[in-house]
């Protein structure tokens, strides 16, 4: 908190007052009131008025005594504090004030130099980094991080569930682990795995806490005192170097990756400043990696901690919040769309930040001499501290109950009525928190998930809130107990992975449409111009989507460009569509010149220009909500341009931007275009984007669109099972290139669709298999462009034919149905989508066959289909056992479909089953998670392997590798394999091979037979869980010797195994209990892995 103390002036601004200005300044000095405050003592100033252990509480106490503006003297320097909304409103005027970096924050420059948080005002490195990084925090990019956020939130919930209802949870520590892991994974694709180190924090956190605390202490002590604290200074430098080393390691790890994630770290490494064209230096990259790791988790963990403190102190509010989650989400998986439907959760978080702003202040300084509040004179360069805990409890704004936790005051209808700058926990203006949307989405998700799954009570009902202060604040010593709701068990929690998508991915939609060329578009049609203003890429993505949507109406002669290029360049012979947003109350960087041009009054008459404006915004910025789109719309209309349609808007806080754009397009823009530009009736027949693909017949070609695929030649195939049981197969191949695989690793296989499914498509559209199709599209859709392929190859090798139809697919099919009965049934399917379509895996092809009156062009059908994806399989052959070779063990999925009389054919498994010796397949090696490998010291650490069916695959490679290890005369710790199947002569996979390995002493095999219970080899055990109980003593013996347990199989099997082992062994630490769950839910291939 002493970031607000010890200010020694700033380096940003100097001022010279001379001439007539000096005379006015002297008069203001005479008229100005003295800023109140306690009387300072000689030498020590007001040091004795401040409790250095509780600086925040001390300063708030002074605020209560001395009023909205007061000053104290620390280290010989005056410190000024503003504590009222009225003064903060003035201080947030960026035409008069800018950010000052001073005191504790300035001390952090040793750590992060000119990083986004610690840079001085106007520092060049900050400008470059800020312009490069803003697009990485656009709403679509943030939404794309939802799944990774959910992954880590699940880890937290699973930890609490497994520790049980009697466990006392240090909630602040766990939220610190969560938020640090989240920022590292979501922005840098780097797993810190903090939840697997239960007793200690990650070394980065340990070093960070010391550095933050020491920066705080240094800022509060006189310079002479700091000069003699030599050991503390050395320790601070040591911890700073430790943090920078971790950042370097993250960067080094990323640079080694051949196909890095397209995330914030990738932007740091490869981004270019749109103004200077420069990239960021290595030191600047390190500075900002550290900035994001610190700022990206520290305040969010505090927010979550204070939020749950207030919730458990107010059970009625907690229950109301749980009710909102239950009614909105139920027990389903939380999606990113749900977050906009939880307004009370949003209000709770806002109110928590009002009560306890975790970054308790920010500092500004006047650009020139200013009078504040009409009576206090401030010199240029004088830092003024905005004391948020006092400002956010200003009774003139929040009423006499300002000290009470009352989320209702933060609901949208009340929040929008607050005066300007009443709620500023994320800072101000261009130096406000760049990661606000990231932190908010994470906090909403975590609160919703915890309330969905747990009832919470304080561990100590008599606990009184204590504050732990560094440069941020958190509760000190606050603990809770968490009990699972809905009669859930720890093993039953999260049986389905979290999904950021309901029907479509906003982020992938954005990425898909953004591929369109800025400079090239199909010519020869109606002209249209799209101008966008976009810092984060969102409005650019919307412009591309809208351009794509309008192509079927003949608008194929398209221009897409940034708004600044429209200065004196607005065309008169075509529609002009403008899509933009407001950034900190101002135009986006690429729209500033255009807005300035409109505001200049020098705009020539715009008669003859037909335009429409679509604006994006977020309702939390109440004072500037849609400001720039509205301003552009009004100024263009005032200058004589013709408004084609009422302005469209999209509120990113509560809606899907693309859906809002689509609604405006259909209800406002298209009717206006029809009327003004006389669209033909033939265009009107295609309102649903059916003809984005333009098709002609030509010659065929083969697949080459996937990266990192290598060729492999099949050498051996065999069936492993009796004809009376579901088929399992073995396929062996030789790699046509070098690999670095280890036992337990995987390969991604590029399959083709089953021939019978392809024939259904050809029959549906009356195509011969050898027809040639050429796709000429303004959007790539992941398909070969302007290159002929045969119809059979296109539907075999490029697209998913069995993927469940989306709601949007159903909408299009309903719109093209000729029969009213079919139309109504398709609408009904939209209303019951989850149960009747998604869960039954009803594909677009299934629907076309079911509803023959649907008249869907083949181009529209192709555009509905996702690109064919790779399938992941676990290798069942150790590289050391047979170099340059690999093998797969898989179940062939051929079973009754859930939605009718047809058979459901797994794409990957049926493709592999069709291969014969000599066949070529394309695959890419994929390492397993690090924990799912053999121990480094196989001579000391025993292993226990547990699996069923084709889950044996990775363990076969483990055993083979152990065989090689033994043949090299190396000692081996004991290995136990528990294997479940139907019966000895049904599907006891690799029985002979395993018997040989057993005879060699490499492994001991313990079987369970589900269909032949009286066979002695299984000792009457039906499932592996039963065999585990029967072998309890052997398991406990190996567990006592530090054994590692590996589990591979279906989710149900793994859940049952975990339940048995927890009874036998107690708590299962993740580093010694490793699972791989194959994805039964897809019904595509039971050897596909969730890893």
Curated annotation (Swiss-Prot):
Its cofactor is FAD; FMN; heme. It holds the Pfam family p450. Keywords: Electron transport, FAD, Flavoprotein, FMN, Heme, Iron, Metal-binding, Monooxygenase, NADP, Oxidoreductase, Transport. PROSITE patterns: CYTOCHROME_P450 (PS00086), FAD_FR (PS51384), FLAVODOXIN_LIKE (PS50902). One of its GO terms (molecular function) is NADPH-hemoprotein reductase activity. FMN binds at residues 534-538, 613-645. Heme binds at residue 433. Binds 1 FAD. Binds 1 FMN. InterPro entries: Bifunctional_P450_P450_red (IPR023206), CysJ-like_FAD-binding (IPR003097), Cyt_P450 (IPR001128), Cyt_P450_CS (IPR017972), Cyt_P450_E_grp-I (IPR002401), Cyt_P450_sf (IPR036396), FAD-bd_FR_type (IPR017927), Flavodoxin/NO_synth (IPR008254). Transmembrane segments: none annotated. It comes from the Eukaryota. It catalyses: 2 oxidized [cytochrome P450] + NADPH = 2 reduced [cytochrome P450] + NADP(+) + H(+); an organic molecule + reduced [NADPH--hemoprotein reductase] + O2 = an alcohol + oxidized [NADPH--hemoprotein reductase] + H2O + H(+); dodecanoate + reduced [NADPH--hemoprotein reductase] + O2 = 5-hydroxydodecanoate + oxidized [NADPH--hemoprotein reductase] + H2O + H(+); tetradecanoate + reduced [NADPH--hemoprotein reductase] + O2 = 7-hydroxytetradecanoate + oxidized [NADPH--hemoprotein reductase] + H2O + H(+). Its EC number is 1.14.14.1, 1.6.2.4. Residues 707-935 form the FAD-binding FR-type domain. Residues 528-669 form the Flavodoxin-like domain. One of its GO terms (cellular component) is cytosol. CDD domains: bifunctional_CYPOR, CYP120A1. Self-sufficient cytochrome P450 monooxygenase that catalyzes the regioselective in-chain hydroxylation of alkanes, fatty alcohols, and fatty acids at the omega-7 position. Performs hydroxylation of C10-C16 n-alkanes and C12 and C14 fatty alcohols; and thereby enables the one step biocatalytic synthesis of rare alcohols such as 5-dodecanol and 7-tetradecanol. Converts 1-dodecanol into 1,5-dodecanediol as major product with very little sub-terminally hydroxylated products with the 1,4-dodecanediol and 1,6-dodecanediol more abundant. In the N-terminal section; belongs to the cytochrome P450 family. This is Self-sufficient cytochrome P450 monooxygenase CYP505E1. It comes from Aspergillus niger (strain ATCC MYA-4892 / CBS 513.88 / FGSC A1513). The lineage of its organism: Eukaryota, Fungi, Dikarya, Ascomycota, Pezizomycotina.
